[in-house]
């Protein structure tokens, strides 16, 4: 009889997987990081910190003019000059954020948004041209012999650069407009139950919603072409051959999606798609004495955390006063990240701060609710820590995120332009006092955390995997090599249809010939019979 410790097979497998995920099996490598600024950068930097800790050389390549990407001790920052200044960039960004709160006519608002987006697209494309034509920098990047390019493909310049340098790429993203993530992975994307980005549809759609789901990408096709086509033209110029946008995004060896099926709806995936939703929840830290004091002073009622994200610094006075009025009518202490003008009616229970440790505050047991713009980072921090939400989506996929969480019973959504002080007050009291919201978000939190490998470890593993194997061609589906009609088997269907029609035609002709023969023979017999009777 065997003696000793008997470890059940599932626990043993999980333990080995966890051990593999934390051991630095890859030799020290060189990682070129081309990030997208803003909130996209904030989660990527956690992966860079871990890659550096595991002995890899990390180089971040970005514009001289940016929001958050500054020198840190776990990467080397390389910047390149562009033809516009920090002041010009800041003015453009301010115009973008101010447009969130405009209440003008829909067509005027749409026109203004399109103008802002067009200006931003032109600036980003111009900076890409300046990067790729910076011969000294490109020579330096070639000479450094990087093992992998880690980038967010929200802007396509890094995809062009990775292909130009012939370096395997790992994409780190939430999503890409125009369904380029589906096209780049050749992932099935049926419109019958997979809601399109920006539609706010769920996965259970009515007939009219499915019509909207099918038509929406068609309506955006012109805008998508206008934004992405310049990068295809730039790549075609560099490679001296025709290169499409899909060719650029298909270069990625592995796609690291900042999502999972707790927040997102179930859908098909491909072998090189890895889900790392909640990666920004890693590395929680103790609160400073300042924030601990705020929480201790809140008493039994606890606190509410309020942040509309890193891009919103100023709210119109009338709207800010309506918000302040609602916050003053709840017993909780409210920590509001706000750098704009202090509302004149701000109540004693509301504390304005220029910055707050959002994830760490949400992880405190005295936090009762989270007022958020429903960006993916904030939503995941809410899920990780089990805090119900009042959501005020402003732009982009925030409307979709809010719809998902509201559908799952984890929060309440308000239209920030139309809501009144009473609406916000009622929403806060609902998510704080109605236990179902807390129960639902705790259920989502439990599902999200029940996994063998943490998202950060998973992301680092796949970056190292691509470095070790110089890509991941074995995960690339053959669908990339098919034409559109081969992918949908239209040539096979056409061939089989032609065979069926040919067989049917020959059968018909044979039957017709036989019928005529039989009919002709009967006619001759009848004539012969008549002639005999006469």
UniProtKB/Swiss-Prot annotation:
UniProt xrefs under InterPro entries: UDP-glycosyltransferase, UDP_glucos_trans, UDP_glycos_trans_CS
Protein name stated in the entry: UDP-glucuronosyltransferase 1A5
Record keywords: Endoplasmic reticulum, Glycoprotein, Glycosyltransferase, Membrane, Signal, Transferase, Transmembrane, Transmembrane helix
Keyword Kinase: no
Provenance organism: Homo sapiens
Note: UGT1A5 isoform is part of the UGT1A complex locus which displays alternative use of promoters, first exons and terminal exons. The locus is defined by 13 first exons, which are alternatively spliced to 3 other common exons and 2 alternative terminal exons 5. From the 27 possible mRNA isoforms, 9 produce functionally active polypeptides (UGT1A1, 1A3, 1A4, 1A5, 1A6, 1A7, 1A8, 1A9 and 1A10) called isoforms 1 (i1). Use of an alternative exon 5 (5b) as terminal exon is leading to 9 additional alternatively spliced products termed isoforms i2 and which lack transferase activity.
S-S bridge residues: none
Organism placement in taxonomy: Eukaryota, Metazoa, Chordata, Craniata, Vertebrata
Pfam families in the cross-refs: UDPGT
Quaternary structure and partners: Homodimer. Homooligomer. Interacts with UGT1A1, UGT1A3, UGT1A4, UGT1A6, UGT1A7, UGT1A8, UGT1A9 and UGT1A10 to form heterodimers. Isoform 1 interacts with isoform 2/i2 suggesting that oligomerization is involved in negative regulation of transferase activity by isoform 2. Isoform 1 also interacts with respective i2 isoforms of UGT1A1, UGT1A3, UGT1A4, UGT1A6, UGT1A7, UGT1A8, UGT1A9 and UGT1A10.
Single GO MF descriptor: glucuronosyltransferase activity
Family listed: Belongs to the UDP-glycosyltransferase family.
GO cellular component, one term: endoplasmic reticulum membrane
Residues bearing carbohydrate: 119, 296, 348
Expression tissues: Isoform 1 and isoform 2 are expressed in colon and small intestine. Neither isoform is expressed in liver, kidney or esophagus.
Compartments, as annotated in UniProt: Endoplasmic reticulum membrane
Reaction catalysed by this enzyme: glucuronate acceptor + UDP-alpha-D-glucuronate = acceptor beta-D-glucuronoside + UDP + H(+); zolasartan + UDP-alpha-D-glucuronate = zolarsartan-1-N-beta-D-glucuronide + UDP
């Amino acid at each position: 009889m065997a003696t000793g410790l008997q470890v059940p097979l599932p626990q043993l497998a999980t333990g080995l997987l966890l051990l593999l995920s934390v051991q630095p099996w890859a030799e020290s490598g060189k990682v070129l990081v081309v990030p997208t600024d803003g909130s996209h950068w904030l989660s990527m930097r956690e992966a860079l910190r871990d890659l550096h800790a595991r002995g890899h050389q990390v180089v971040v390549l970005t514009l001289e003019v940016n929001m958050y990407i500054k020198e840190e001790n776990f990467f080397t920052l390389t910047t390149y000059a562009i033809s516009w200044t920090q002041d010009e960039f800041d003015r453009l960004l301010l115009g973008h954020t101010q447009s969130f709160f405009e209440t003008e006519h829909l067509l005027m608002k749409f026109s203004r948004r399109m103008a802002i987006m067009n200006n931003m697209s032109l600036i980003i494309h111009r900076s890409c041209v300046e990067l790729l034509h910076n011969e000294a920098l490109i020579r330096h990047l070639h000479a450094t012999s990087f093992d992998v390019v880690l980038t967010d493909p929200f802007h396509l310049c890094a995809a062009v650069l990775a292909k130009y340098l012939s370096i395997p790429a790992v994409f780190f993203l939430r999503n890409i407009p125009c369904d380029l993530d589906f096209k780049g992975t050749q992932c099935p994307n049926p419109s019958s139950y997979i809601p399109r980005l920006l539609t706010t549809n769920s996965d259970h759609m009515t007939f009219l919603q499915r019509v909207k789901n099918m038509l929406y990408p068609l309506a955006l096709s012109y805008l998508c072409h206008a934004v992405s086509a310049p990068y295809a033209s730039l790549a075609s110029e560099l490679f001296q051959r025709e290169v499409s946008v899909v060719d650029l995004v298909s270069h990625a060896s592995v796609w690291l999606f900042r999502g999972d099926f707790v927040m997102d709806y179930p859908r098909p995936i491909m072998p090189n798609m890895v889900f790392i939703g909640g990666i920004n929840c890693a590395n929680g830290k103790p609160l400073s004495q300042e924030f601990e004091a705020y929480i201790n002073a809140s008493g039994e009622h606890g606190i509410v955390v309020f942040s509309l994200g890193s891009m919103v610094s100023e709210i119109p006075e009338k709207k800010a006063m309506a918000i302040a009025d609602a916050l003053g009518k709840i017993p909780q202490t409210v920590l509001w990240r706000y750098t704009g003008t202090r509302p004149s009616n701000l109540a004693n229970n509301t504390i304005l701060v220029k910055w707050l440790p959002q994830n760490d505050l949400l992880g405190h047991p005295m936090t009762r609710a989270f007022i958020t713009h429903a960006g993916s980072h904030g939503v995941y921090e809410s899920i990780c820590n089990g805090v119900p939400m009042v959501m005020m989506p402003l732009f982009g996929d925030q409307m979709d995120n809010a719809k998902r969480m509201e559908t799952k019973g984890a929060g309440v959504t308000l239209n920030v332009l139309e809501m009144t002080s009473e609406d916000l007050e009622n929403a806060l009291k609902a998510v704080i006092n109605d236990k179902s919201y807390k129960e639902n978000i705790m259920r989502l939190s439990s599902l999200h955390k029940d996994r063998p490998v943490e998202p950060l470890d998973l992301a680092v593993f796949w970056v190292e995997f691509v470095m070790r194997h110089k890509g991941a061609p074995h995960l690339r589906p053959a669908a990339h090599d098919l034409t559109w009609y081969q992918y949908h088997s239209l040539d096979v269907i056409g061939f089989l249809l032609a065979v069926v029609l040919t067989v049917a035609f020959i059968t018909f002709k044979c039957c017709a010939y036989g019928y005529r023969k039989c009919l002709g023979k009967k006619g001759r017999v009848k004539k012969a019979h008549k002639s005999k009777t006469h």
